[in-house]
């Protein structure tokens, strides 16, 4: 099934200037990057985006990391995009991620683990709408 999913290249990717390499993994998997933009999240935006994790011990460090520098937010499109992207991202903990995955090859630790990807269709819709307006998404097909 043709799906869209949200991808975030986290501050460690931007800081280390490896966004192009990460994008190669995405494109080589058959997924298309249909729109992307670089932004600097505010604390409020980061807390709102990750509010599902508010009660977790890692919430504050996650928020501090996500506002530490620019991120690249992307909409990916392809067959089974959600599960495919989660597969090429690799395990959340890079120590458990397979070689050949983004986290396995590039992540420094569980906190600076390079990427975020939607985990369900419902979350993909919510997360894409969080970063991209309807106008931005509709204008993809206009020249």
From Swiss-Prot:
It catalyses: a 2'-deoxyribonucleoside 5'-diphosphate + ATP = a 2'-deoxyribonucleoside 5'-triphosphate + ADP; a ribonucleoside 5'-diphosphate + ATP = a ribonucleoside 5'-triphosphate + ADP. It comes from the Bacteria. CDD domains: NDPk_I (cd04413). One of its GO terms (molecular function) is metal ion binding. Its cofactor is Mg(2+). It is found in: Cytoplasm. SUPFAM superfamilies: Nucleoside diphosphate kinase, NDK. One of its GO terms (biological process) is UTP biosynthetic process. PROSITE patterns: NDPK, NDPK_LIKE. Keywords: ATP-binding, Cytoplasm, Kinase, Magnesium, Metal-binding, Nucleotide metabolism, Nucleotide-binding, Phosphoprotein, Transferase. NCBIfam families: PRK00668.1. Belongs to the NDK family. Major role in the synthesis of nucleoside triphosphates other than ATP. The ATP gamma phosphate is transferred to the NDP beta phosphate via a ping-pong mechanism, using a phosphorylated active-site intermediate. This is Nucleoside diphosphate kinase. It comes from Ehrlichia ruminantium (strain Welgevonden).
């Amino acid at each position: 099934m043709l799906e869209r999913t949200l991808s975030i290249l986290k501050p460690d990717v931007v800081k280390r200037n490896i966004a192009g390499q990460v994008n190669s993994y995405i494109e080589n998997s058959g997924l298309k990057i249909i729109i992307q933009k670089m932004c600097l999240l505010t604390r409020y935006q980061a807390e709102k985006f990750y509010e599902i994790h508010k009660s977790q011990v890692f919430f504050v460090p996650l928020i501090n990391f996500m506002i530490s520098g620019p991120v690249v937010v992307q909409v990916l499109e392809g067959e089974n995009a959600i599960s495919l992207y989660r597969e090429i991202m690799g395990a959340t903990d890079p120590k458990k991620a397979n070689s050949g995955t983004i986290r396995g090859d590039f992540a420094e630790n569980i906190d600076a683990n390079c990427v975020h990807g939607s985990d369900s269709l419902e979350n993909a819709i919510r997360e894409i709408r969080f970063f991209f307006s309807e106008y931005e998404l509709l204008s993809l097909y206009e020249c």
